[in-house]
Amino acid sequence: MSETIKSDKTYVLDNYFDETTMSLHLKADRPILRKKWTPWNRNPVMDEKIITQDEMDALIQQIFDEATNEKWNYLEIDRKLSKVLQLGPYRIVIVYPPLSDATEITAVRPVKKTTIEDYNLSPEVMDLLTNHAKWILVSWAPGSGKSTFVQALVLVYHQNHHIIKTIESPRDLMVDEDVVQYSFTHWTHDEVRDILLLSRPDYTVYDEVRNTPDFELYKDLRLTWIGMLGVIHATKPVDSIQRFIGCIEMWIIPQVIDTVIFID
C-alpha cells in the first residue's frame, strides 16, 4: 500500500514542502514556485512572496551545513558554478551565475512510497519481473514515477533475498539499508565496473542510463549475466531501445534488453 514519504529527521527544506509538494523552484528575487502532486494532476503554484538574494545565500549555507553534519547526506556533484546534493529525501540542484542568470535552487522529493501491489500488475507480468526477466528497462518522461516503481520492485527483490546494488547520481533511491548504493561522484565508470564484476550482485539498479559511458557500462554488466534494472528517459517504449542504438552494437541489444516497462 502506498504511503506518504516522511523523514525521521528535519531539514531546512521542510519549511517549503507539504505532503503534496513534489518540487520547489527558487530563483533569486523572484516568487517561490512549487509543483504540487494530486492523483491526476501536477500543478505549479506560485507564492506571492519573493525570495531575495540574501535569503537564497542563507538557505544555501543551511543546506551545506546539514549536508556535512549527517552520515547519509551527500554532496554528489561539486563544480564551481553548480552543486548537486542529496539531503535526506531531497535531491537539490544549486546553480550560480554566470551559468544561470541568477542564483537558482531546485529541490525535488518523492511524495509517495509505493509497493508493487499498488500497480495492479497482472500475474503474468509479476511472474515475468520476479522470475524470468533479467534485463529490464523502466522508461518514460522525467517525473513520471519511474524511480518510484523501481523502488517497489527492489523491495520485492530484497524480500526474495537477492543481493542488490545500485548505481545512482545522485543517490536518491529510497531502498533498504542492505542495498549498497554506488555513485560516480568519487568513482569512474571503469572503477564501478570492476567493483561490480568482482562483487557479483544478483541485480544492479542503474538510475539512470544517460550517456554513452552509461550505455557501455550497462552492456558490460549485463553481458556478464548480472541482472540489470535500468531507468531511462523515453517518450515511447520503442524509444527506450532506440536510445541504445549508436551507443552499443545493434546486434548486442537483444542480449542486453529483454523487457521494457513503460510508466504511462
Sequence positions of predicted segments:
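Switch/coupling sub-region of P-loop NTPases
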Residues: 163, 167-251
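Residue-level signature of catalytic and energy-coupling elements of molecular machines
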Residues: 24, 94, 221, 225
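Flexible glycine-/small-residue-rich
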Residues: 26-28, 36-38, 87-89, 96-98, ...
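P-loop NTPase nucleotide-binding module
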Residues: 111-112, 117-170
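Charged, alpha-helix-enriched surfaces in structured cytosolic catalytic cores
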Residues: 16-19, 51-58, 76-82, 86-89, ...
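Conserved beta-strand/loop subsegment of P-loop NTPase cores
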Residues: 229, 257-262
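N-terminal accessory targeting/assembly segments
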Residues: 1-79
